[in-house]
């Protein structure tokens, strides 16, 4: 399982430094790992926590809370929003909280929406009633992985490398801010019309495009390797050739599409002539 290295909790735990993260094609996982290794934070994989129904965590007095996730349709992914609505942080009292989103070009108002989700969960309020808010916010540009709209494609290899090298340099700066618990730092690439991206296009995206009904597999090409079901973060794929369960849990991360070694999976017809991407696919990204 792609998330097998992340240690899960069997009971309520006292955490020291924690990053909750979700990643579909590996960009956000790599970013979260760079931060965790640099500051000694523990990575908690959101899909694993959802599988195990583990939502309650005890905070230490000086706990630092971090969230890392990709931008999906200029909004936080469905799976991240579902997790936040169930998260319980015992002892939350003005703890330093930061959040980072990865995106192909810009992220619109994804962080505004994310903070609204935090504020709406009363289980995240402090003892005096103040909501948990991510005060320090970052976006990191990473290689594009969304390919289901006419104007969106994967990046050429040279642009992939350029984005990752830029991200690597940016992360040194981000890590120093997190280490020092600097509040109120906002470094976001929102784009030219962020409200249009998130509240109009993004709303349509989440209503119409976040679905498994458009996925299909070419049975003549499928090698029955089972990779697609292994990488699905919501366990929405069974069997070989794969069958999508249509259970409403698909978060449209496109992991099944991108990780298929023979390009047997497609989303409608638009991806048939599109390339695939996941982090370190060719072994040249570390």
Indicate residue ranges for each PLM-predicted region.
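Conserved short-loop catalytic and cofactor-binding motifs
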Residues: 68, 102, 159, 219-220, ...
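Active-site-proximal loop/hinge segments that shape catalytic or ion-binding/gating pockets
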Residues: 277-285
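A short, structure-level motif marking secondary-structure boundaries and short turns
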Residues: 98-100, 212-214, 241
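Iron-sulfur cluster-binding cysteine motifs and their immediate structural context
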Residues: 217, 223-245, 249-251, 255-272
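A generic structural signal for alpha-helix starts
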Residues: 23-26, 105, 223, 251
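A mid-sequence, solvent-exposed acidic-amphipathic segment
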Residues: 190-224, 230
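FMN-binding flavodoxin-like domain, especially the glycine-rich phosphate-binding loop
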Residues: 2-18, 25-31, 37-50, 56-69, ...
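A generic structured-segment signal
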Residues: 20-21, 232
């Amino acid at each position: 399982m792609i998330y097998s290295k992340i240690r899960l909790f069997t009971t309520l735990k006292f955490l020291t430094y924690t990053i909750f993260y979700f990643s579909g094609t590996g960009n956000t996982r790599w970013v979260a790992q760079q931060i965790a290794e640099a500051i000694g934070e523990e990575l908690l994989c959101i899909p694993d926590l959802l599988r195990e129904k583990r939502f309650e965590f005890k905070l230490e007095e000086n706990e630092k809370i971090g969230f890392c996730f990709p931008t999906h349709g200029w909004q936080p992914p469905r799976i991240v929003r579902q997790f936040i609505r169930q998260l319980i942080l015992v002892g939350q009292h003005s703890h330093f909280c930061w959040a980072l989103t990865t995106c192909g070009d810009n992220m619109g108002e994804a962080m505004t929406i994310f903070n609204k989700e935090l504020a709406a969960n009363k289980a995240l309020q402090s003892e005096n009633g103040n909501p948990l808010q991510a005060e320090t916010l970052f976006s990191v540009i990473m290689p594009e992985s969304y390919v289901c709209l006419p104007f969106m494609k994967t990046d050429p290899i040279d642009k992939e490398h350029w984005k990752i090298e830029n991200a690597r340099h940016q992360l040194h700066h981000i890590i120093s801010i997190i280490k020092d618990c600097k509040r109120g730092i906002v470094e976001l690439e929102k784009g030219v019309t962020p409200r249009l991206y998130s509240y109009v296009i993004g709303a349509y995206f989440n209503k119409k495009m976040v679905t498994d009904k458009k996925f299909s597999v070419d049975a003549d090409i499928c090698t029955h390797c089972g990779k697609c079901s292994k990488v699905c973060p919501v366990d929405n794929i069974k069997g070989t050739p794969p069958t999508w369960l249509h259970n409403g849990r698909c978060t449209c991360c496109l992991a099944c599409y991108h990780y298929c070694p023979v390009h047997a999976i497609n989303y409608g017809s638009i991806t048939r002539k599109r390339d695939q991407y996941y982090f370190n696919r060719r072994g040249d990204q570390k």
